């Protein structure tokens, strides 16, 4: 670990915190329909959209109607993406003449982008046409992020409102999230990325003649065959426009298979820093929005404090683990010097190094982004355990756009309930009595997540002809690959231990179901909880009310997240990355 590395980490989090308050205050104004500086331009566009779609903007929805609208919209857009993938060979903007996407892979991809997971069991350069990338996938990057923001705002309204049966209008919330929040930032961000070297074109792929042709010799049917490659195909495409929303919307699906380690997606250290900041910007801002809309700004900062504690613990552990030398490479100098990074540089880009790779891995899995600038499968066992653990916490450490906040607020309900039990009185949260139904919905939300991850992982491990053939490493690392895949899918993250071959019938179908359940089945109890809170009468604060604006609350919330979230998966982690670390220190490998 170096001073330079810690300085970059410090600059990153300082930039996020500086941007959180102005963006959070702005989003509160947007969703409370107060005046903003973009209104003269966007209000006419908004009204036109409502007129064209027959949306009655002033009519608010019960939580069941809000949920139904969200599900209908998601199902319709998922079907649209599936159809585009299947018939892309007949559509324009396909200069490489790529064929239609196979049915199971198209199903997996459509669910993936609808749920904000962006799991990619395919190589984009050789699978998706430009039209599919733009109309089928990039649009979902906006839609799925806007849905997440809308759901978070609905939950905040549930907390803030008293004796009301409605949570807002889904169509209005989603529209305003796109027009007022996502689009303006993405336009500016895409231009900045282009200035750094991110490409934006509709050209056919470029065939370049290499300076030194490469020869490969292999044995085929008992004969030695030598092939010489004198050209290289360089993929092109409209990358910058998709890269901006990929990061800002915590989507994560790469235009290229190498994702943000590809120089056309993330060419410079500055673009790398800006992409990381954009991942955390809206989730951090939403904690300020929470404080603004509930009338308790200090509560928003207390929630943000818990996120910061968990984030720092993760990035410090990952950075330390990756800066350590591999104990099996006895004959290699792995010490950091002026001319080499030292530590574990396998799977990392030299333009980023260990600090930025560890920071990016932590950020992308704290949020449900899933973009990568280094290969998580090549991390040291404990370094790779950090992104896995971040996902297993439910991705509430900043979390995905919107989804991270409502997931964190479910943990807040549980923490307040536990605090009430400790002092022997009915728990209260910002003027709401927390009763049996609220705790039941919160626990249902929290139980679905580990059941899906551990259930599917167990089936994959116990089926020699389904799950096991796809792992590239036997032993504990193979288990970690499977755990990571189902954690990433259920947590709507999308990153992977890429040594797992996920483009099989079993993984395309099972991971598709995991993504669907992890997104939509968990939303139902969350909205039910929000709807129930909105109907409650206001409970005046007394001396016995547990304060949710203090450092004590932040510590309690962090503790509940660790106990309820992390310890659930400790046995599985013990058989995966922890065991692999111990065996590595003992000189064992697989």
Curated annotation (Swiss-Prot):
Domain of life according to the entry: Bacteria
Primary localization class, coarse: membrane
Ranges that cross the membrane: 11-31, 64-84, 136-156, 178-198, 273-293, 301-321, 403-423, 442-462, 511-531, 552-572
Localization terms from the record: Cell inner membrane
Membrane topology term: Multi-pass membrane protein
One cellular-component annotation, GO: plasma membrane
Pfam family, one: KdpA
Keywords: Cell inner membrane, Cell membrane, Ion transport, Membrane, Potassium, Potassium transport, Transmembrane, Transmembrane helix, Transport
Any GO MF annotation of the entry: P-type potassium transmembrane transporter activity
UniProt family annotation: Belongs to the KdpA family.
Record HAMAP family: KdpA (MF_00275)
Subunit details: The system is composed of three essential subunits: KdpA, KdpB and KdpC.
Job of this protein: Part of the high-affinity ATP-driven potassium transport (or Kdp) system, which catalyzes the hydrolysis of ATP coupled with the electrogenic transport of potassium into the cytoplasm. This subunit binds the periplasmic potassium ions and delivers the ions to the membrane domain of KdpB through an intramembrane tunnel.
Protein name: Potassium-transporting ATPase potassium-binding subunit
Species per Swiss-Prot/TrEMBL record: Acidobacterium capsulatum (strain ATCC 51196 / DSM 11244 / BCRC 80197 / JCM 7670 / NBRC 15755 / NCIMB 13165 / 161)
């Amino acid at each position: 670990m170096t001073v330079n590395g810690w300085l970059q980490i410090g600059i990153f989090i300082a930039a996020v915190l500086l941007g959180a308050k102005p963006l959070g205050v702005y989003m509160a104004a947007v969703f409370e329909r107060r005046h903003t500086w973009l209104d003269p331009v966007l209000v006419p566009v908004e009204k036109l959209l409502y007129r064209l779609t027959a949306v009655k903007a002033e009519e608010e929805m019960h939580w069941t109607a809000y949920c139904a609208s969200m599900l209908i919209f998601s199902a319709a857009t998922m079907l649209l993406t599936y159809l585009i993938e299947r018939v892309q060979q007949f559509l324009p903007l396909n200069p490489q003449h790529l064929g239609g996407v196979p049915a199971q892979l198209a199903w997996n991809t459509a669910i993936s982008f609808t749920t904000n997971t962006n799991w990619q069991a395919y190589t984009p350069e050789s699978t998706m046409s430009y039209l599919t990338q733009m109309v089928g996938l990039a649009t979902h990057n906006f839609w799925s992020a806007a849905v997440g923001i809308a759901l978070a705002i609905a939950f905040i309204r549930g907390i803030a409102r008293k004796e009301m049966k409605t949570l807002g209008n889904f169509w209005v919330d989603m529209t305003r999230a796109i027009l007022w929040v996502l689009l303006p930032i993405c336009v500016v961000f895409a231009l900045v990325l282009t200035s750094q070297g991110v490409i934006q074109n509709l050209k056919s792929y470029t065939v370049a003649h290499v300076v030194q042709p490469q020869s490969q010799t292999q044995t085929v049917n008992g004969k030695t065959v030598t092939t010489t490659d004198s050209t290289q195909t360089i993929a092109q495409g409209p990358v910058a426009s998709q890269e901006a929303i990929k990061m800002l919307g915590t989507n994560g699906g790469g235009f290229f298979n190498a994702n943000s380690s590809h120089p056309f997606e993330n060419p410079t250290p500055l673009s790398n820093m800006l992409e990381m900041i954009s991942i955390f910007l809206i989730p951090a801002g939403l904690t300020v929005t929470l404080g603004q809309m509930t009338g308790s700004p200090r509560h928003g900062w207390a929630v943000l404090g818990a996120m910061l504690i968990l984030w720092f613990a993760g990035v410090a552990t990952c950075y330390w683990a990756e800066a350590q030398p591999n104990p099996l490479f006895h004959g290699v100098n792995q010490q950091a010097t002026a001319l080499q990074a030292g530590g574990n540089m396998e799977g990392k880009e030299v333009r980023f190094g260990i600090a930025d790779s560890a920071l990016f891995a932590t950020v992308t899995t704290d949020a449900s982004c899933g973009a990568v600038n280094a290969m998580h499968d090549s991390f040291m066992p404990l370094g790779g355990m950090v992104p896995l653990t971040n996902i297993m916490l439910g991705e509430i450490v900043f979390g995905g756009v919107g989804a991270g906040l409502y997931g964190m607020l479910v943990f807040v309900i549980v923490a307040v309930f536990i605090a009430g039990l400790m002092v022997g009185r009915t728990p209260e949260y910002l003027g709401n009595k927390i009763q049996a139904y609220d705790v039941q919905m919160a626990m249902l939300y929290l139980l679905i997540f580990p059941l899906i991850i551990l259930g599917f992982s167990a089936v994959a491990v116990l089926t020699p002809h389904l799950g096991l053939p796809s792992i590239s490493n036997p032993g504990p690392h193979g288990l970690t690959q499977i755990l990571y895949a189902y954690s990433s899918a259920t947590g709507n993250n999308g990153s992977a231990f890429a040594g797992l071959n996920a483009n099989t019938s079993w993984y395309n179908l099972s991971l598709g179901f995991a993504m669907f359940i992890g997104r939509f089945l968990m939303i139902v109890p969350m909205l039910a909880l929000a709807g129930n809170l909105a109907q409650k009468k206001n409970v005046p604060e007394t001396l016995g009310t547990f304060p949710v604006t203090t450092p004590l609350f932040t510590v309690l919330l962090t503790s509940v997240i660790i106990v309820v979230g992390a310890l659930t998966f400790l046995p599985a982690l013990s058989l995966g990355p922890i065991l692999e670390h111990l065996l590595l220190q003992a000189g064992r490998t697989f």
